[in-house]
């Protein structure tokens, strides 16, 4: 399968035009399909018929049409997800060539989020209601106090249970009386905005010098590699966070790639202290629902920082 194709973000294809689709199936070539009535763009995620099945693919380039066009089938569905960026298409191609991995295998790595063919889903959340409680108990009081103190927030059942240290039956009882409102909310919501201007730990002169160099490299907007040498506990992480902060100041996204064993609560709390909120996460301990949210928010540029294990490289 040749991937020597120049990708341009302006390519779009109207109803019936031929497009070449890369699927995740073990097929060593692109497959030609006709664009659906609503059209598709370069990088559109689509669902296409392949034999009796429907499989996920990406519109990779214009179709070749080098066989009987009467046998070419039409794309079944254009998925309601952001298009793959030309930079990502080029990245997958380059990594595939470097690692001798077929391009369909690379696409499989980039589409590991579950439920990509599903429409945006909803979840049940809880907020303060307008009703009165007929009988107050300590458990009910804790729930209502939390909702009153955080009136601008919504909680899932699990979050509210843990915050108030109550059972779900306590929450449901308050819902039945209208004191707590049970609402539907989009499941794939953006992550809280991070603040790169929050003060960092006091850096030594050597750390500050290294951090300044990293920030300068980020501002140059070109690829570069920087290796920090230092013993454990010497503050290398704080220096790398200076580079992350510069990315955020420039409106860019950042990926912090670390071994899964290092993905600890303490490390995430450290990032929260530096930027005001916890970042998105991608690793084996993350639920499938949260992985779908992370994948979508990264694609929509609504996840500023992702902390992840190796597989997060292909988000």
Residue ranges and their predicted role:
Residues 1-315:
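Accessory, non-ATPase domains that flank or precede helicase/AAA+ motor cores in DNA-metabolism machines
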């Amino acid at each position: 399968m040749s991937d020597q194709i120049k990708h341009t973000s302006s390519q779009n294809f109207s109803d019936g035009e031929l497009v070449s689709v890369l699927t995740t199936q073990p097929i060593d070539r692109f497959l030609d399909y006709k664009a659906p009535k609503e059209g598709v763009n370069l990088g559109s995620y689509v669902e296409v018929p392949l034999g009796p099945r429907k499989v996920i693919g990406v519109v990779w380039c214009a179709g070749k049409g080098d066989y009987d066009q009467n046998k070419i089938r039409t794309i079944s569905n254009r998925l309601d997800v952001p298009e793959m960026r030309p930079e990502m298409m080029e990245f997958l191609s380059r990594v595939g060539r470097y690692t001798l991995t077929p391009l369909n295998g690379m696409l499989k790595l980039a589409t590991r989020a579950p439920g990509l063919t599903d429409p945006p889903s909803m979840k049940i959340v809880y907020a303060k209601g307008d009703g009165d409680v007929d009988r107050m108990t300590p458990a009910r009081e804790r729930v209502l106090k939390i909702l009153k103190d955080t009136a601008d927030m919504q909680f899932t059942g699990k979050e509210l249970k843990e915050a108030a240290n109550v059972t779900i039956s306590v929450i449901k009882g308050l819902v039945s009386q209208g004191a707590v409102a049970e609402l539907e909310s989009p499941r794939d919501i953006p992550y809280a905005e991070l603040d790169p201007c929050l003060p960092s730990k006091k850096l030594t002169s050597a750390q500050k010098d290294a951090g300044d160099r990293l920030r300068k490299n980020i501002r140059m907007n070109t690829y570069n590699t920087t290796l920090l040498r230092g013993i454990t506990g010497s503050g290398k992480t704080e220096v790398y966070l200076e580079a992350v902060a510069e990315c955020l100041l420039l409106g860019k996204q950042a990926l912090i790639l670390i071994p899964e064993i290092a993905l600890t609560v303490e490390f995430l709390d450290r990032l929260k202290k530096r930027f005001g909120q916890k970042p998105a996460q991608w690793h084996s301990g993350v639920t499938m629902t949260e992985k779908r949210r992370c994948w979508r928010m990264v694609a929509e540029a609504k996840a500023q920082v992702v902390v992840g294990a190796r597989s997060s490289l292909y988000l």
